[in-house]
Amino acid sequence: MTRDRDFLTSLTVNLGLFSNIVLAALKTSIGILGHSPAVLADGINSTSDVVYYIAVKIFMKQAQKPADKEHPFGHRQLESISAIVVGAFILTTGITIFCESVNTVYELIIGVETGRSASIWALSIALATFVIKLGLYFYTRGTAGKTHNPTLRALANDHLNDIMASVAVIIGVV
């Protein structure tokens, strides 16, 4: 069972990592080329997702080590530590998105910033992100339920956070 659990966990983390790499590259490029600060900010968010997915991979690899003299019960507690790391990233991302949103609304109200029309590419990548993250959320949540892995539960919540950010980007682009 442990081998199946480790395989499912690794597969889920790798799928999320690959998806975030692709989304980060696309959103950052389209945000720049499509003149959409909202999509660019979402691309930077996806880049930070890549960074902590790499950290999660390292934690998960270490958590799979067998028990030894110094750790007679094994290294599985690293999964909980990894979940805390993901939670810290989610909290930081949420605070950053909130602050940027308040700042943008303030600038629109006082007239410093004016609304701009973004390209169809910006809207397309925002919609694609919504669909991809929705799929990743349900898959990761399901795998977390099967494996009882706290890190996967945290990653599922991060996908949910990204879904909400994508909705905000879609609204901002439209």
Model-derived features with residue positions:
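Alpha-helical transmembrane cores and adjacent cytosolic helix/loop segments
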Residues: 1-174
